[in-house]
């Protein structure tokens, strides 16, 4: 099997982060990037068109998904999972991609050695249907410059139980979700190649690793991970709150799934 990996996301008013997100993942071997924009008021469209024009070597697709969003909300359906399902179905039926990964624009798939490509990583576990990578959450830093690159020479990160999952394109796919997916007779592993531990009840269908596993491995770096830039800088953190969660049919002005510009007390202690 030829390994060919696609990356996909939904995004709202994230033009400031689109270039670094695209180039980061293109550098690690993702061969196509697709973004569905919703409720966008910034220059994301123009920016994506500019990147397409100046970087034809990167396959970039984007779509204005407002109509699809409204349809989901009117039917009380999850827009994010619906978008993922549409992208998955289309990619499976019309392309030769073998795998797909769904991330947000504040998430960066990263190999620890900063060299291994996503295809090379997958090739070490060719029989796996799904490979899950734990979040490493950035820590608050009031001295950090606004719009700093996602990585520097010194990175203090907290390992979180949540995962993001690269998955095979297969007709055995039963349900797509945000953190992991349900595949009939699927083989689910972690970044270290071991079987995904715990019961589906404890791990919420493999969306997060078990508590006992985290206690043992919370301070151990993985061969690959997903950097989750929840915090960035104070200004950026406050700005992110204003994007709300309209795609979840949550009409509140602010994001309600954030705890403040503080260390995450649900994650392991920060490590360099």
Residue ranges and their predicted role:
Residues 77-82, 111-272:
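Catalytic-site signature of metal-activated, phosphate-bearing donor transferases
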Residues 97-108:
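Short beta-strand-to-loop acidic/aromatic patch adjacent to the donor-nucleotide binding site
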Residues 6-8, 32-34, 59-61:
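A structural signal for isolated positions on well-ordered beta-strands in alpha/beta enzyme cores
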Residues 1-23:
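N-proximal low-complexity "stem/linker" segments adjacent to membrane-targeting elements
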Residues 31, 98, 129:
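Short acidic/polar active-site loop segments enriched in Thr and Asp
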Residues 37-53, 66-69:
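A conserved acidic beta->alpha catalytic loop
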Residues 23-32:
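Short, acidic, metal-binding catalytic loop of nucleotide-sugar glycosyltransferases
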Residues 52-99:
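Active-site-proximal specificity loops/subdomain of glycosyltransferases
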């Amino acid at each position: 099997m030829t390994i060919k990996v696609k990356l996909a996301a939904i995004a709202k008013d994230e033009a400031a982060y689109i270039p670094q997100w695209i180039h980061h993942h293109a550098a690690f071997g993702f061969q196509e990037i697709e973004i569905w924009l919703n409720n966008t008021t910034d220059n994301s469209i123009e920016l994506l068109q500019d990147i397409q024009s100046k970087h034809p070597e990167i396959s970039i697709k984007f779509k204005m998904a407002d109509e699809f969003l409204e349809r989901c909300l009117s039917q009380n359906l999850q827009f994010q999972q619906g978008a993922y399902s549409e992208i998955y179905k289309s990619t499976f039926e019309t392309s030769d991609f073998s795998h797909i990964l769904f991330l947000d624009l504040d998430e960066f798939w990263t190999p620890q050695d900063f060299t291994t490509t996503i295809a090379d990583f997958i090739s070490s576990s060719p029989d796996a249907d799904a490979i899950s990578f734990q979040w490493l959450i950035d820590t608050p830093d009031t001295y950090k410059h606004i719009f700093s690159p996602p990585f520097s020479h010194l990175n203090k990160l907290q390992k979180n139980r949540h995962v993001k999952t690269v998955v095979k394109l297969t007709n055995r796919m039963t349900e797509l979700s945000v953190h992991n997916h349900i595949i009939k007779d699927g083989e689910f592993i972690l970044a270290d190649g071991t079987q995904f531990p715990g019961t589906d009840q404890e791990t919420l269908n493999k969306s997060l690793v078990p508590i006992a596993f985290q206690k043992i491995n919370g301070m151990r770096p993985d061969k690959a991970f997903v950097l989750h830039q929840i915090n960035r800088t104070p200004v950026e953190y406050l700005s992110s709150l204003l994007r709300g969660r309209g795609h979840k049919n949550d009409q509140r002005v602010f994001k309600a799934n954030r705890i403040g510009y503080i260390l995450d007390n649900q994650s392991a202690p920060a490590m360099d």
